[in-house]
Amino acid sequence: MEMKQISETTLKITISMDDLEERGMELKDFLIPQEKTEEFFYSVMDELDLPDNFKDSGMLSFRVTPRKDRLDVFVTKSEINKDINLEDLAEFGDMSQMTPEDFFKSLEQSMREKGDVKAHEKLEKIEEIMEDVVEATLANQSEAADPSTNHESEPLDYVHYVLDFSTITEAVAFAKTIDFSIEASELYKGSNCYHMTILLDVQQQPSYFANVMYARLIEHANPGSKTRAYLQEHGLQLMLDGAVEQLQKIELG
């Protein structure tokens, strides 16, 4: 099993099929809520070295996403009453008529309404990007193996990304996560948030590099709501060059 903290309120636990089998569980056990399922979730939590803010919280909700070779469980420390758990699934009605896909969609919607919505959306965005990367890689390998599919295209030399932050503190925290080379960065102030532009050199990089880097960036930021052109014309320019480097020098209390 693997655990990753996505935000202050959300963990992602990846459980392999072997892990499920060792614990006497199957995917079908998650289709209908039962005491066995909830006990399984909490036994997994007991095995893992949880962050301090999750220990003895008692107010947890679980979102289950089945994959081909694993089970992804998103654990959210909710601000709502700790009694909100799998019993809430009663509101779904007659689940015997639901397909597994319908059930998981209903479960996801319920957790969205009661949990860390932004974290869930960001996770889904990252997962979509990485799935696209895998598909693109396989497609490129297929084209490389078949000369008849090769065609000339003009590769991009640089890519601009725009990221959003609710506060300047979030922007500083993001800057401190940057441990790779960037060509340029700018910081703007909008009407209700901060915007940062990041310029990356993608020359001599594989075609999926831009997507991979974007996925890394939005792990600690929100996808941009404005274009760089819009910010240059309408945004308040705070740092026009080296924004990341300047923010990295700021000490957070």
Curated annotation (Swiss-Prot):
One Pfam family it belongs to: MecA
Stored Gene3D superfamilies: 3.30.70.1950
InterPro entries: MecA_C_sf (IPR038471), Neg-reg_MecA (IPR008681)
GO molecular function, a single term: protein-macromolecule adaptor activity
Function in brief: Enables the recognition and targeting of unfolded and aggregated proteins to the ClpC protease or to other proteins involved in proteolysis.
Quaternary structure, from the entry: Homodimer.
Record-stated family: Belongs to the MecA family.
Classification via PANTHER family: ADAPTER PROTEIN MECA, ADAPTER PROTEIN MECA 1
Record's comment describing the protein's domains: The N-terminal domain probably binds unfolded/aggregated proteins; the C-terminal domain interacts with ClpC.
Name under which the protein is recorded: Adapter protein MecA
Organism annotation: Streptococcus pyogenes serotype M1
Gene this chain is encoded by: mecA
